[in-house]
């Protein structure tokens, strides 16, 4: 069953965040991730929205997600995002295919 990683990001240090982006794609594609949306200006329908970017990523399985997120390569670049931005994220299960 596929799963979706959703991240709401508020960037506070663009230069440090760029270091994260510079290394992210190479690691990401190695673990079967697929960007479905990266949006800096979503349409807010309800509530307040104080984020710079919203990201939606699909993984074929939760195992693929875990292998990516917990990989030494990703953990090495993750430190840049943690320094540069506030991020609220979650993992949700897809519907049976």
PLM region spans:
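Electropositive, surface-exposed helix/loop patches at the edges of structured domains
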Residues: 68-86
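C-terminal end-helix/capping segment
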Residues: 82-97
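Short S/T/G/P-rich N-terminal loop/turn motif that feeds into the first structured element of a domain
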Residues: 1-54, 58-70, 74, 93-97
């Amino acid at each position: 069953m596929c799963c979706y990683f959703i991240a709401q990001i508020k960037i506070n240090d663009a230069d440090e965040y760029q270091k994260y982006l510079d290394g992210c794609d190479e690691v990401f594609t190695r673990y079967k991730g697929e960007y479905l949306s990266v949006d800096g200006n979503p349409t807010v329908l309800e509530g307040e929205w104080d984020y710079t970017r919203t990201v939606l990523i699909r993984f074929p399985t939760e195992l693929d997600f875990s292998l990516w997120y917990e990989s030494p390569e990703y953990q090495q670049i993750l430190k840049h995002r943690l320094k540069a931005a506030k991020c609220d994220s979650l993992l949700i299960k897809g519907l049976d295919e």
